[in-house]
Regions:
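Active-site loop segments of alpha/beta catalytic cores
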Residues: 1-206
Length: 206
């Protein structure tokens, strides 16, 4: 489906995050089966298989109208920095290069990663989505590519005054930087629709 004058963003989970869900069989917020992850050889083999099928999924989305692809690594923060090269950088870079080979821009979201600057330098996405635990000023100073996101979804559970304050903070910090306003993670189920409407109005009125 192609929409005139609109970008259609396709998305996939990053290989590491999909592996976590496959092995854990649930959200790993409370329970992570860590013993499995000691077998580095097995992990790398599975990541390659996941990567193969993700490329098929990406191609299908592009052929059906997606003109941007976003890669979500929701559980990047589970890893120690020493594990980033094998489990995050290499598999994600392979996907980024594949998306670019289709002449499609790619956004990456390595949630809770400890070094966004290093990630961007190695993986080379066209834009990066940041989470709400990172300092936006540090990102603005250190990241040269377009930035997306950052606002804590819990802010939408407060009041309009607080929501406007936090929203304007991000808009002010990134006013001279290519920036796509978004949340620093998914919207929470209990969020009131009128708060989302107020957020959108605040952004449009800026």
């Amino acid at each position: 489906m192609k929409l005139e004058n609109k970008n259609t963003i396709g998305f996939v989970g990053a290989p590491w995050t999909l592996l976590v869900y496959m092995i854990n069989q649930q959200s790993p917020k409370k329970n992570v089966k860590k013993n499995f992850f000691d077998d580095e050889y097995l992990i790398n083999r599975i990541l390659l298989i996941i990567e193969k099928f993700l490329k098929i999924h990406i191609k299908n989305q592009v052929e059906n109208g997606a003109n941007v692809i976003q890669i979500f690594d929701s559980w990047a923060g589970l890893l120690e920095e020493r594990d980033y090269p094998n489990f995050i950088y290499t598999p994600t870079l392979n996907l980024v290069n594949y998306v670019k080979s289709l002449n499609i821009p790619v956004i990456c979201f390595p949630r809770d990663i400890k070094n966004y600057k290093e990630f961007c330098e190695i993986v080379k996405p066209d834009a990066v989505n940041i989470d709400y635990n990172v300092d936006p000023l540090t990102i603005q100073k250190n990241i040269k590519i377009p930035v997306q996101g950052g606002l804590d979804p819990k802010i939408l559970l407060t009041d309009q005054e607080n929501l406007k304050k936090e929203t304007l903070k991000y808009l002010d910090i990134f006013k001279d930087h290519p920036y796509i306003f978004n949340l620093g993670h998914g919207i929470l189920p209990e969020t009131k629709p009128e708060m989302v409407e107020y957020l959108i109005k605040t952004i449009k009125d800026y």
